[in-house]
Design a protein with these regions (language model features):
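Glycine-/small-residue-rich "gating" segment that lines the acyl/pantetheine channel
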Residues: 120-129, 170, 174, 178, ...
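Acidic, glycine-rich active-site loops and adjacent beta-strand->loop/helix elements
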Residues: 13-14, 103-106, 160-164, 188-193, ...
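Conserved beta-ketoacyl condensing-enzyme motif
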Residues: 7-8, 25, 29-157, 189-199, ...
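Condensing-enzyme catalytic core mediating Claisen C-C bond formation in acyl metabolism
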Residues: 5-9, 29-37, 213-292
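Active-site-proximal alpha-helical scaffold in enzymes
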Residues: 74-87, 138-149, 155-189, 229-251
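Short glycine-aspartate micro-motif
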Residues: 6-8, 96-100, 182-186, 219, ...
């Protein structure tokens, strides 16, 4: 059976290391980390990766007041990806766009903030915001993109821990091949630095990294003095199209997705299973028609 080839025609991102692919890549190659110390509720000063972008570039004051940080990151990344793709977006059928955004977790930030806020009023829930539920539903980051852009095609947020962004890309590829959409926005976002629970959780596991003098040296996984990770926020969204559609409009083709695979370790909550990892990679290479050896 013929399957359409799926290509990437646009990339948009925001990260502690930059707000464009060019800036992000240059900082990576130059060894720039841009980790800083932030003062986090109940935790004190902790190292974190903080994005530096202007959400007002694409959002109104009302959207920012009602929405979430994850939503702002998702909207910024999606809008930048659309611009990068060269699509005539405003004149396209928005019902033929799909939005598939992966996230590790969502809703913790908003719930923590509300509990803290009502603690000032003896935990009187009359002071609990009516925006809480729409902010914390799992599909929020993808949903905020559709509200901002006017996209009326399918959208949902995919939870797959640290692989959620990849899962979003795979879902987009499958929907394009099924003909459910003509263009897909897919990727991943995280607002984790806004949640003290994330930091406290990693600290309780002995996995929250520190460095005695330089926060930029905190993340050092291949160093014998390594002692944990750095929690960061950020997002990246790709524009995906069928190859024939991209070629027909003369699009700049950045890359092609030639293979993928998802599996499960089925062994532990956090410890990776090397056998399952190797199995997944070999299966992806097989789908791509590539020799693992």
């Amino acid at each position: 059976m013929h399957q359409s080839r799926i290509v990437i025609t646009g990339i948009g991102l925001t990260s502690p290391n930059g707000n464009t692919l060019e800036e992000y890549r240059k900082n990576l190659l130059d060894g720039v980390a841009r980790i800083q110390m932030i003062d986090l509720r109940y935790m004190g000063m902790v190292p974190a990766g903080v994005c530096d972008f202007d959400p007002k570039k694409y959002q109104t004051r009302k959207e920012l007041r009602v929405g979430t940080r994850a939503g702002s990151i998702a909207i910024y990344s999606a809008r930048e990806a659309i611009a990068n793709s060269g699509l005539d977006f405003e004149n396209m059928d928005k019902s033929r766009f799909g939005v598939y955004i992966g996230t590790t977790e969502h809703g913790n930030v908003e719930t923590e903030n509300e509990v803290y806020n009502i603690s000032k009023f003896e935990y009187d829930t009359r002071y609990w915001t009516h925006h809480h539920n729409p902010r914390t539903v799992a599909n929020n980051p993808a949903g905020e993109i559709t509200i901002n852009t006017g996209i009326t095609g399918p959208h949902y947020t995919i939870g797959a821990a640290c692989a959620a962004g990849n899962a979003g890309l795979i879902q987009a590829l499958q929907m394009l091949r099924l003909g459910e959409v003509d263009v897909a926005l897919a990727g991943g976002v995280s607002e984790s630095i806004q949640s003290f629970g994330i930091f406290a959780g990693f600290k309780s596991q002995g996995a929250l990294g520190t460095h005695e003098s330089d926060p930029n040296k905190t993340s050092r996984p291949f160093d014998k003095t390594r002692n944990g990770i750095v929690v960061s926020e950020g997002g990246c969204v790709y524009v995906l199209e069928r190859l024939e559609d991209a070629q027909a409009r003369g699009a700049k083709i950045i890359a092609e997705i030639v293979g993928y695979k998802i599996n499960s370790d089925a062994s532990d909550y956090v410890l990776p299973n090397p056998e399952r990892q190797a199995e997944c990679m070999r299966a992806a290479l097989k789908v791509a028609g590539m020799d693992a050896e």
